Amino acid sequence: PHARIIHIDIDPASIGKNVRVEIPIVGDASVVLEQLVSAIRGSADQPDAESLGKWWEQIKQWQSRDSLGFEMSTEVIKPQFVVQKLHEITGGDAFVTSDVGQHQMWAAQYYGFSNPRRWINSGGLGTMGFGLPAAIGVQLAHPEATVACVTGEASIMMCIQELSTCKQYDLPLKIVNLNNRYMGMVRQWQ
């Protein structure tokens, strides 16, 4: 709540869109970050070993917390639990695709990726319906691999017709539909 936020975005309309920003910077993030790094490296105000030690201690304290913990329910199956089970069942070796929404956040946080290039999603581009076509592409590229599309009921409806493609090419990909009966992320931000 007391964070001082610097928001770098190439699109001025996005600055401060979701949270209050203390320092807005319009520009290409890669260019701006290079400039900031150069400015910091050129500064005489460099942290000393003691300050860095304290910082690393703080980081270790944060890492020791179970910040992704959640309470199990006897009433419903929690989406976090589903994604953790997916990781357990696949041994963490699946290619996982996702669209945009709360299911994307849960997949990113709870799958526990340990292999490179296994998390296929559109990032912050807001592309509902990305997950299933991406899973089809990954399955075609890696026919022997386990491919799972973690999606939500609104996202999967953007491209549900692609199930016929899965049938046509006999693709064994898995679809994990985390149905919360809402466009959850839209509702969350409203």
List where the protein language model places each region.
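Active-site diphosphate/adenylate-binding microenvironment
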Residues: 54-138
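Thiamine diphosphate
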Residues: 15-18, 24-26, 30-36, 106-190
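An acidic- and aromatic-residue-enriched active-site/binding cleft used to recognize and process polar
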Residues: 10, 101, 152-154
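Generic enzyme active-site microenvironment
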Residues: 7, 97, 150-151
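Glycine-rich, acidic loop regions that bind phosphate or pyrophosphate groups
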Residues: 1-54
